[in-house]
A protein has these predicted regions:
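Short, mixed-charge, low-aromatic patches
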Residues: 57-60, 87-89, 142-151
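Acidic/His- and Gly-rich active-site-bordering loop/insert found
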Residues: 1-88
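Acidic/histidine-rich catalytic neighborhood of metal-dependent amide-processing enzymes
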Residues: 96-161
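Conserved active-site and cofactor/substrate-binding residues in soluble primary-metabolism enzymes
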Residues: 19, 23, 27, 93, ...
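Active-site metal-coordination/substrate-binding segment of hydrolases
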Residues: 58-116, 124, 128
Length: 162
């Protein structure tokens, strides 16, 4: 069983400011190739992991790899059950949950696509998810999508640039 707090802290400790997500993308690709039964694609610094069970429906679960620029707050710090550090909330905590889920899912009831993409924190013209929709739409096609952005536990409809 993966400890989500430890995994999130590990992700926080990997610098991944916008346009500099390669090291984090490499970690996601390596973990997914080594620990899942999913088909893995790499497009630049986007990592896509897909089940290929030919189920009737597909859910897309996506999260961005980048953070805002560091300001002396890069390193992870755990205090009890709370994690502090650059990107802990937006969105490396969500990424940890998504990665752990991708590693745990064997035979989902619906097909699933996990999309880990760069450049969400900057201008929409650089957004890695938008680039995937333009260049590789078959990799991000689905019936419904969930993004793990922090929303104070509220359901929100929308995404930058879409």
């Amino acid at each position: 069983m993966i400890d989500l707090l430890d995994l999130a802290a590990e992700l926080v400790d990997i610098p991944s400011e916008s346009h500099e997500e390669t090291a984090l993308a490499d970690l996601f690709e390596r973990r997914l190739r080594d620990g899942s039964n999913l088909a893995i694609d790499r497009v630049g610094d986007s990592v896509i992991a897909r089940s290929e069970l030919n189920n009737e429906h597909r859910i897309v679960i996506a999260g961005h790899l980048d953070t805002v620029p560091a300001n002396g707050n890069q390193q992870a710090h755990i205090d009890g059950d709370r994690l502090y550090g650059l990107g802990a909330c937006d969105m490396k905590g969500g990424l940890a949950a998504q990665l752990a889920t991708a590693l745990a899912v064997d035979e989902p009831a619906v097909d699933v696509t996990f999309v880990f993409y760069p450049c969400e924190e900057v201008a929409a013209q650089y957004n890695g998810l938008s680039h995937l929709f333009e260049s590789h739409p078959q990799l991000v096609d689905g019936d419904v999508a969930l993004l793990g952005e922090p929303t104070s536990a509220a359901i929100e409809a929308g995404c930058q640039g879409t």
